[in-house]
Amino acid sequence: MGKAKRTGARRQVHKAPAGASGGPAKTNPNPFEVKVNRQKFQILGRKTRHDVGLPGVSRARAIRKRTQTLLKEYKERNKSNVFADKRFGEYNSNISPEEKMMKRFALEQQRYHEKKNIYNLNEDEELTHYGQSLADIEKHNDIVDSDSDTEDRGALSAELTASHFGGGVHKNSSQKEGEDGDKPKTRKELIEELIAKSKQEKRERQAQREDALELTEKLDQDWKEIQILMSRKPKKSEDKEKKEKPQPDEYDMMVRELGFEMKAQPSNRMKTEEELAKEEQERLKKLEAERLRRMLGKDEHENKKKPKHTSADDLNDGFILDKDDRRLLSYKDGKMNIEDVQEEQSKEADGQENDQKEGEDDSEEEDESHEDSEESEDPDSHSDLESNIESEEENETPKKEQRQTPGGKLPKDDQKAQKAVAAELPYVFAAPESFEELKFLLSGRSMEEQLLVVERIQKCNHPSLAVGNKAKLEKLFGFLLQYIGDLATDSTPDLKTIDKLVVHLYSLCQMFPESASDSIRFVLRDAMHEMEEMIETKGRAAFPGLDVLIYLKITGLLFPTSDFWHPVVTPALLCMSQMLTKCPVMSLQDVIKGLFVCCLFLEYVSLSRRFIPELFNFLLGILYIATPNTKSQGSTLVHPFRALGKNSELLVVSDKADVTTWQRGSLPLHWANRLSTLTATEANHTRLSCVASCLSLMKHCVLMYQALPSFHAIFRPHQALLSKHLADCSLPQELQELAQSILSAMEGQKQHCRPLVCEKSKPVPLKQFTPRLVKVLEFGRKQGSSKEEQERKRLIHKHKREFKGAVREIRKDNQFLARMQLSEIMERDAERKRKVKQLFNSLATQEGEWKALKRKKFKK
């Protein structure tokens, strides 16, 4: 079949040139332009429509068609031969005529100023002046005033025409008229005429003023007559006017109130941290100098001269020279040398001024900080009225002899005052360079004095005062930590002082967070190393001392505990978890330490609500050792607790008398350091207090973790101990009520997740007797459930094919228009280049002619 077709095609090709039918002869296509779409398989009955194609012919046909249609529309895009009424709002009755005119004017101006093609640089804007083109104005010699309303606008006047184009006739005629008429006035005549005009104007103004006065007097008389008539009216009108007076508005009242309000007075600017630190340091230095002066027994008024009482018959002959101010007369270069005298006098004057300033400062400081010392003095000492009965020997003795030597004995009152001053705290402290120096400064002092010493150390060594103060305060943080540890490890730990020192630790931590975090990490690392070494050597580790517990408490106060990861808090959490899992509970002291660590855990995770499994394990162990040992308790214990053994019933109370006498109270923290020997009753009371603390912590955990999906799975062991075993124990009524409230809170929580259950086996379906008919379709055909579905798929396929064809044609149209636009741009550029070249040629020709003419002139 294929060969037959090919032979037939060949015959047709040979027969084509012969025009036997009389029609036009068909041209044979170029074989290189023919594209044959070869098919892999010949299928009988299938009609092939696009097996042979001519791409060049089809492309030329498409270009010719676009030239006849699309190019024609593109060239006529700005042409219009149909009159369309495009006036704004012409057929809109809702707009007033004024609004229509305004909007039309705006659109006209907008259309006038907008460029048709923003990329066409050859398109210039037409410049206008008062609505008239500048090109038209430049053609006229005279600029016509736009404000003139004459009908002959732009026309030349007759005088101007006669003066410019009269040929001199206008000038001669004006001269003749001047000769025939009066002669021009002289300067004297002009001045007399000006004076006469000014006098005439003055007379007219005087007449107008007199007329105005007469009218005013007449109006005054008329007003008096009318006023008499108005005064005779009844009082009802006045009452009505009073009633009709408007009440003051709230706004007016508010404005008046604001007008009378006191205005804020400007205050001094706020001082920076550096300025405040400098002022505080200066104040402490002055106070320290005052303290040292009082400690040495120096009188503050010894340099001041006491006023002496002079009698009426005093001859004022008691004048004594304080010092011999006589000078040796000397000459230099024939002149008296007085420079030394002037210099000494100036120095003495400066010294007196400084003494006065220091005295003023000392008096201010004494008024502020030493009120007690002032109160001790007698206000009515009458020092200004002391008698002048003093021996001449005392007046003649110099001041050095009056003062006592340092080795001399002081009076008893002075000795007591000196001892009190010596016991007073200094105001200036140097930063300690070692822990021993800090301990020497703080040891033996009360809590208030220790806090005051630390505060003054910080103020005197503020980082803004000197360069090295930052390193000193960073060391101070570590020394304070070590000092707190020493206070905690004493036999009677001073917890109040530790609590107050935490405030200074917090301020130092805010100033130097990096060094503070390094110091606390170092302390926690040492505690963990000690615990690991003890586990390696002994196989188990004891709970750390009270100092480590206080360090963990301070860590939670100084640093944020809600962060996902923190360089200090995260190691602290790990340290606490290691304590609860690796330190066995051997005594009541260990129970107290473990409960304190549980409290710290809850404080750390109060915001983040992070799940801590070690916490629940330890609380479960505490509840377990508070119940008697039985075979099955519904829970499994994890290290460090044991189900059976020596300490498996550590918190069990068997004496009912102790149960009845127990009163709930908080566990003292100093018991964690050292638990003194207790009696049996005190030990049982301590056990019950531990159980109460455990139950309160359990209730707090229930409220915190109630939103967890695994809530019931976590608290199931605790619930079993509380409901079955702890209820059987003889506990106080208060603890039983607390346990019941915890159980009710657990049972009241909804179960957020369902436990996994094995899938049940599927039921065996019943046998169906109705056969299932399946339509067997040919391979490769598009299958559909119904005719409607098949029609829908056919339309979707057709739409997709047509859409692709439309996109292809639009893309080709855009390419065609782009080629046309590019050709236009190239034509315009070529035309512009041609004109520019022509201009350059003409200019070159002109320049050549001018140079030739110039050379010709030079030759002549």
Swiss-Prot record:
Q: Which family does it belong to?
A: Belongs to the NOP14 family.
The molecule here is called Nucleolar protein 14
Q: Where is this region: Disordered?
A: 1-33, 161-417
* Residue stretches of biased makeup (Low complexity): 16-25
Q: Which PANTHER family match?
A: NOP14, NUCLEOLAR PROTEIN 14
Q: Which domain of life is it from?
A: Eukaryota
Q: Where is the composition biased (Basic residues)?
A: 1-14
Q: Name one GO biological process term.
A: rRNA processing
Residue spans of biased composition, Basic and acidic residues class: 174-225, 236-260, 270-303, 320-357
User: Lineage in the entry?
Assistant: Eukaryota, Metazoa, Chordata, Craniata, Vertebrata
Organism listed in the record: Mus musculus
**Entry's localization field:** Nucleus, Nucleolus
Chain's role: Involved in nucleolar processing of pre-18S ribosomal RNA. Has a role in the nuclear export of 40S pre-ribosomal subunit to the cytoplasm.
